[in-house]
From Swiss-Prot:
It comes from the Bacteria. One of its GO terms (molecular function) is rRNA binding. One of its GO terms (cellular component) is ribosome. It comes from Clostridium beijerinckii (strain ATCC 51743 / NCIMB 8052). This is Large ribosomal subunit protein uL24. Part of the 50S ribosomal subunit. Keywords: Ribonucleoprotein, Ribosomal protein, RNA-binding, rRNA-binding.
Length: 104
């Protein structure tokens, strides 16, 4: 499955309990179509103690969400946007904001 966002992209959540939150993509999982976004979809994980190294605790961490629930966030428009792919004169591909023309 192809994902429209990449690692280190700034995205905004468009549906679900975290609707409206923005964050950076920490990791993308193309096989499952999910992304891990910083500060979004926080879950509590019960961590088991290891031999003298780590104490048992309840840790809050990000869980992956479906990539269809996020859109790329354009810093110039200050809005969620769709992207188009454009080939420059030197042959390199860039992603372009459909609203303002800013490159990512």
């Amino acid at each position: 499955m192809k994902i429209h966002v990449r690692k280190n992209d700034t995205v905004i959540v468009i549906s679900g309990k975290d609707k409206g939150k923005t964050g950076e993509v920490l990791k993308a999982y193309p096989k499952t179509g999910k992304v891990l976004v910083q500060g979004v979809n926080i879950v509590k994980k019960h961590q088991k103690a290891n031999k003298g190294q780590v104490e048992s605790a309840i840790i809050e961490k990000e869980a992956a969400i479906n990539s269809s629930k996020v859109m790329l966030y354009c810093n110039k428009c200050k809005n969620a946007t769709r992207i188009s792919n454009k080939v420059l004169d030197d042959g390199t591909k860039v992603r372009v904001c459909k609203k303002c023309g800013e490159t990512f």
